[in-house]
A protein has these predicted regions:
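Anion-binding and metal-coordination hotspots
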Residues: 1-6, 11-495
Length: 495
């Protein structure tokens, strides 16, 4: 009972019930599309799975029917799929609605926007329809053998999602930004926004257009370390500025931009430990291979496997393979190792924010972890995949439902932040799952059965959370009477 009730409360707090009531009216047969969508979203938040599982198992074992005043007919298989077909046209209106709710509930501001991309894959053959977005492309899930779609997401530094877009799986990262800039300006107007992005997303051409825009569009962008080689001599002459404990930056003004070299001592330790571990393994493996009696083909295959596993550490070792026999020699490239050591734990950023303090610039950039957390929650807690749908329209609707569930997740996290920052939304939902609705059966003299549904008493943790979140449990439901011979629901639902 508890998790369903809490999810419905979050849904209503975002006024999604009011938003969808105006856009998903009931059918002539009385099908409540908005209640079906609410069930899909709460299911995705609480115990994600397929629509088939929702239809066959989860709904009957949950309290969603009691909370919504609906019976099992609400989640007939066809109704679930037909509901998915109705939601996508309202995506843009939903973004505007959510922006206002984030502002009203939490005082969210939209001066700084974080932008990033992820992908989700499908274990299926490429579709014949050329307009289908499921395509092969660069896979962040390391599944280049599978077709995929790319998901672009914009969130605020506090993690409140503002918009997303589903793109073809073969979309190059650096071709996505221009379209998103135009969409945000069209929907919300031009404003003094700061866009924070990781390297590889904007091209030099797009950044130039952002600088020349009226008003100029501000940005802070990660830059590939290869550019550090060109700027290394100039940066050596610049002083370090401590912006916080363990974080130092150097500033290098250019003609139209400001370069920021950031150094994190904690990151240095982490990257150095990772590099040492990989290099130690590679050195041991090369020593092992040098003592094996292998054919030339076997040697090349094993060296290739070692290179794949060692990754960046492979470039720190010079390997010479004898062209005549199955033998090789190897030696540590100390010059390259010294160069790598100098760059460990360092980030090169570029921006047109000349007037901001170094500490502000660093704070903006590290907030990219919020969008990384969003992708982690979508793929982890909310189980974005596997996706079982066959058409791209329903695939996009599935992602849309996951996005709505993530909005509930973010709302709960924002509510927890000032009162219990150490608790995750998933931990709270798990605590509320333990609140059960029990059916107590009393036979009557007329041969009928009186059923009293009662939820279990809250334990200390649950009472504290209900109090701290300023919640009030719903009243105990009224008794029900079943006719003689009618089979009542035997299992107790989780509220």
């Amino acid at each position: 009972m508890g998790a369903c009730w809490l999810s419905c409360h979050l849904y209503e707090q975002l006024e999604l019930d009011r938003f969808w009531a105006a856009r998903l009216p009931d059918s002539r047969e009385g099908t409540s599309w908005q209640h079906i969508l609410q069930t899909l979203v709460c299911y995705r938040l609480i115990d994600p799975g397929s629509e088939w599982r929702l239809h066959r198992q989860w709904f009957e074992q949950s309290a969603m029917g009691d909370l919504l005043g609906e019976d099992y007919s609400l989640v007939s298989k066809n109704a679930l799929y037909r509901c998915l077909d109705k939601v996508l046209p309202h995506k843009t209106a939903l973004f505007s609605h959510l922006r206002q709710r984030w502002q009203d509930l939490f005082g969210a501001t939209f001066d700084v926007l974080l932008y990033d991309l992820t992908s989700t894959y499908f274990e299926s053959d490429p579709p014949d329809d050329e307009s289908d977005k499921r395509r092969h492309g660069y896979s962040r899930d390391k599944r280049s053998d599978c077709v995929q779609v790319v998901i672009a997401l914009i969130v605020t530094p506090e993690g409140f999602p503002l918009a997303y877009e589903v793109l073809p799986g073969n979309t190059a990262d650096n071709t996505t930004l221009r379209g998103f800039l135009q969409k945000i300006e069209t929907q919300y107007g031009k404003a003094q926004r700061i866009w924070v992005m990781d390297r590889g997303i904007p091209t030099d051409e797009v950044l130039a257009q952002m600088r020349q825009s009226d008003p100029p569009i501000s940005y802070l962008v990660g830059t590939p370390k290869g550019r550090l080689t060109k700027l290394e001599q100039a940066l050596l002459k610049r002083p370090w500025h401590e912006v916080r404990d363990g974080i130092d930056v150097k500033l290098l003004p250019d003609e139209q931009e400001l370069y920021v070299l950031a150094r994190s001592r904690a990151r240095i330790d982490k990257e150095r430990a990772m590099r040492q571990r990989k290099l130690k393994w590679l050195w041991s493996r090369l020593k092992e291979l040098s003592t094996m009696r292998l054919t030339r083909e076997e040697l090349l295959m094993k060296l290739g496997a070692a290179r794949t596993k060692a990754r960046a550490a492979w470039r720190l070792v010079d390997i010479e393979i004898d062209p005549q026999i199955a033998a090789f020699s190897y030696a540590l490239n100390r010059d390259r190792l010294r160069k790598v050591r100098r760059r460990e734990g360092r980030y090169l950023l570029r921006t047109n924010l000349y007037e901001h303090q170094p500490a502000e610039l660093w704070k903006f950039y590290i907030q990219l972890v919020e969008i990384e957390a969003a992708f982690k929650n979508l793929k982890g807690d909310l189980q974005l995949r596997p996706i079982y749908h066959q058409t791209i329209e329903r695939v996009e609707a599935h992602i849309f439902v996951a996005f709505l569930a993530y909005c509930l997740h973010v709302t709960l996290r924002a509510r927890l932040r000032p009162i219990a920052s150490g608790l995750t939304p998933r931990a709270v939902l798990d605590k509320f799952v333990a609140i059960q609705m029990l059916d107590v059966h009393f036979p009557t003299t007329e041969g009928r059965t009186l059923i009293l549904s009662r939820y279990t008493e809250l334990n200390a943790d649950q009472k504290l959370l209900v109090s701290q979140l300023d919640l009030e449990l719903p009243p105990q439901p009224p008794p029900r009477i079943t006719a003689a011979g009618q089979i009542a629901r035997a299992s107790a639902p989780a509220l």
